[in-house]
Amino acid sequence: EFARDMEEVCPNTLFLNYTNPMAMLTGYMQRYTKIRTVGLCHSVQVCSEKLLEKLGMEDKLEGRRELIAGINHMGWLLELHDKDGNDLYPEIRRRAAEKNATEKHDDMVRFEYIKHLGYYCTESSEHNAEYNPLFIKSRYPEMIEKYNIPLDEYPRRCVEQIKGWEKEREDILKDGKVTHERS
């Protein structure tokens, strides 16, 4: 419905879709509406920050410079330098290998990519496990445990989001007020 409103009110706009299911929604908009649409993944914007935090390198966050390239949902962090121009990848590779060897965590698939491909992928380990046939295999269910892949992550997240929306709806209906904090 909002696409039809946009066709009427702002037909020359460019719609930037950051919502999931991103590919399906973007494809629908491109096929069945006249609105120019691009689908984008939010993972690119937080990729290097989350990587440095996961590896205990928070002191490198400020002033960092990065180069990311690739297609949507499969971008790669090709370069990451600190504020002084030092390449952070040698230390990232060392810490990622150590972390994967010594503890279970939520980024094991992407750290395995670093081990074999040399670079960090922008998309989550859960999505990478879905996209790449090496991690979720019916003949090797132990891979799911080995790489700590939460097969129920997205359904669980949806359940929590729906609960949040229901609470928000109840709050709005109760007092008629909507609050918003600038992010």
Region annotations inferred by a language model:
Residues 23-26, 47, 75:
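Flexible loop/turn segments at secondary-structure boundaries
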Residues 8, 27-37, 53-59:
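Short, surface-exposed basic-aromatic patches at helix termini and helix-loop junctions that form
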Residues 35-51:
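Acidic, His- and aromatic-enriched active-site or binding-groove loops in soluble protein domains
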Residues 15-19, 39-41, 68:
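A structural signal for short, well-ordered beta-strand segments and their strand-loop junctions
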Residues 53-183:
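Long, compositionally biased stretches enriched for glycine and/or charged residues
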Residues 1-32:
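Rossmann-fold NAD(P)-binding glycine/threonine-rich loop
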